Design a protein with these regions (language model features):
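FAD cofactor-binding and catalytic pocket of flavoenzymes
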Residues: 94-122, 126, 132, 150-154, ...
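Conserved redox-cofactor binding core of oxidoreductases
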Residues: 67-112, 117-118, 127-132, 137, ...
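N-terminal glycine-rich phosphate/pyrophosphate-binding loop and immediately adjacent elements
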Residues: 2-141, 146, 151, 155, ...
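Aromatic-residue-lined binding/catalytic grooves and analogous aromatic/hydrophobic interfacial grooves
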Residues: 28, 243, 248, 364, ...
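Short, glycine/acidic-rich hinge or "gate" loops at secondary-structure transitions
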Residues: 52-55, 171-183, 485-494, 566-569
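A conserved FAD-binding loop/helix module that cradles the flavin
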Residues: 539-557
């Protein structure tokens, strides 16, 4: 691919129509849309170059092929202590996560920030659940009188949901539910025998007010040009050589490169956006080369900030001037505030009797989804907003006998047979935006490159605590209603970041006095700067947000291209 390695001495050689900061899900979409509209674009990625297929070095390995059989060493944990708190500490993907000793952050309150600094970002590692938001979500703040109103509604984003779904490839079922709009889907994956049975029982016992459906996933169930359908390996996080799921590498990057309009520059830490006081617009960005520590400047007519919710805020805050001492976009006092996430680490599981003669095909890279029902259609709780569940049913394997005191041939024969059916569902719930949930620049602490780090100060509050109690209670009740036995519940607590859906910090709004971005994702303080990743979110809904990032980005990029053509920016 075209890589930019210019010296930085010649301005003409460093001038483009558009700059995209970041190469993850939203950055990839920005590059695809901008280059598709004919704009010469440079994508700046702070991490290493990472090529599709070639760099998926563990994707073809079996567990026994790894030195530590999939586990990680204490030395590896020291390098990545935050990742080691959760499931991300796995030998096949440890190198995909950021070196936290080189790029630390400060926790005023416990905060789990999962970062992947490489071309493609976390698009290689994401869970691929892809759900549209509805007007229940876009209108929630206004109806509840909480925070500020979204400046858009579902109708504004619906055609862009269509646009990104058709390109990305989303498998799913048509359900006709107003709180979870249907989309442009590939054929759905199949629910297994137990999932279908449990879903039918829940639907019947709750009078058709609760719906367990197959997940809507960015995994192909039919091949499309340049990509093969999902192989049901369920090892997506190692990278898919088949292009079976959507990522920057498999999808948006090849499309952008095919236009001939994209240049990619890895190892490029954008330290600040260059603001022109006379035009009141950005004129480019300053870049620190992560390998050489040399500084360069790149210039463009439009800048898209897609570094992920927290890093995008870092770039804006670090772009302070005498006009904007709090950073570019700070005029409202909301930059860095209103951090959100999703509830995680809670739910219920149990055993399903029967179905001993049933099994399932392969390792489906998807699960089931229980659609939101709380605080909708006359249902009223003692908290605001709602939640959904994700989970799956499966049969236990040989590991069920690890703690048993058995030996001999009979024992060996027993563990070759599938065990009992089990089903589990975990809650994903909405967190409200709070001004006091914030990040700030800590200039007393520096990273490997001498740059100020982020300080995290965010916690869940009373509304979230009430919701967590209800999530667990309803999970147990639904499984009981479906005849599930030996039900166990869990709530392991929640630190912001656990859901890996960090949002907020540069929210959209209708008024520049209370928001950072307008209805087109333009920074109020510099109309040629756009932010379209998680930073832009005004509320968090309970659905996975990545599909909405894609739609917002495609919408904003095409708006930017139109405005450039008109000479408005």
């Amino acid at each position: 691919m075209p890589l930019n390695n210019v010296s930085g001495s010649a301005k003409a050689g460093n001038t483009y129509d558009a700059i995209v900061i970041g190469s993850g899900i939203s950055g990839g979409w920005a590059a695809k849309e901008l280059t598709g509209r004919g704009l010469k674009t440079i994508m700046l990625e702070r991490g290493r170059n990472f090529e599709h297929i070639k760099d998926y070095k563990t994707a073809a390995k079996d567990p026994w092929d790894f030195e530590h059989r999939g586990s990680v060493t204490q030395e590896q944990r020291k390098v990545r202590p935050v990742i080691s708190r959760n499931w991300g500490a796995q030998e096949p993907i440890m190198d995909y996560w950021v070196n936290e000793q080189e790029a630390p952050y400060h926790e005023v309150k416990p905060f789990n920030w999962w970062r992947s600094y490489q071309l493609g970002g976390r698009s290689i590692l994401w869970g691929r659940q892809s759900y549209r938001w509805s007007d229940f979500d876009f209108e929630a703040n206004a109806k509840d009188g909480w925070a500020i109103d979204w400046p858009i509604r579902y109708k504004d984003l619906a055609p862009w949901y269509d646009h990104v779904e058709k390109f990305a490839g989303i498998s799913g079922s048509l359900e006709g539910l107003p709180q979870l709009p249907d989309g442009h889907f590939l054929p759905p994956m199949d629910m297994n025998w137990v999932e279908r049975d449990v879903a039918a029982r829940i639907k019947k016992n709750y009078n058709d007010t609760r719906h367990m459906i197959i997940g809507r996933a960015a995994n192909l169930t039919a091949a499309i040009p340049g990509r093969t359908q999902c192989q049901f390996r369920n090892r997506c996080w190692e990278g898919c050589p088949f292009g079976g799921y959507f990522s920057t590498q498999s999808s948006t990057l090849p499309a952008a490169l095919a236009t001939g309009n994209l240049t990619v520059r890895p190892y490029s830490i954008v330290t600040r956006i260059l603001y022109d006081k006379d035009t009141q617009k950005a004129k480019g960005v300053e870049v620190l080369d992560a390998e050489t520590n040399k500084t360069y400047e790149y210039y463009a007519k439009v800048v898209f900030v897609n570094a992920s919710a927290l890093n995008s805020a870092w770039v804006l805050m670090n772009s302070a001037t005498d006009i904007w001492p709090g950073g570019l976009g700070s005029s409202s006092g909301e930059l860095g505030h209103n951090i959100m996430d999703h509830h995680y680490n809670l739910g219920a599981s149990g055993t399903v009797e029967g179905f001993e003669d049933k099994y399932y095909y392969g390792r489906r890279a998807n699960g089931i989804y229980v659609v939101r029902f709380a605080n909708l259609f006359g249902d009223k709780r003692d908290y605001l907003r709602g939640f959904g569940y994700q989970g799956a049913a499966s049969r236990t394997g040989w590991s069920r006998e690890i703690a048993e005191m058995n030996i001999g041939a009979q024992y060996k024969d027993a563990i070759t047979e599938p065990g009992d059916w089990q089903i589990g569902i975990g809650g994903f719930g909405e967190l409200l935006p709070y001004h006091d949930n914030k990040i700030t620049l800590d200039k007393t602490r520096k990273d490997k490159w001498g740059l100020p780090i982020l300080s995290m100060d965010a916690v869940i509050r009373e509304n979230e605590k009430k919701m967590r109690v209800d999530i667990v209670k309803e999970a147990k009740a639904m499984l009981e209603s479906a005849g599930v036995k030996n039900i166990e519940t869990h709530d392991r607590g929640h630190n912001i970041g656990d859901g890996i859906h960090e949002m907020g910090t540069a929210r959209m709004g209708r008024d520049r006095k209370t928001s950072v971005l307008n209805e087109h994702n333009q920074v109020w303080d510099a109309k040629n700067v756009f932010v379209t990743d998680g930073a832009a979110m005004t509320s968090s809904a309970c659905q996975n947000p990545s599909l909405t990032y894609m739609a917002l980005t495609a919408r904003a990029a095409n708006f930017a291209a139109d405005e450039l053509k008109k000479g408005n920016i």
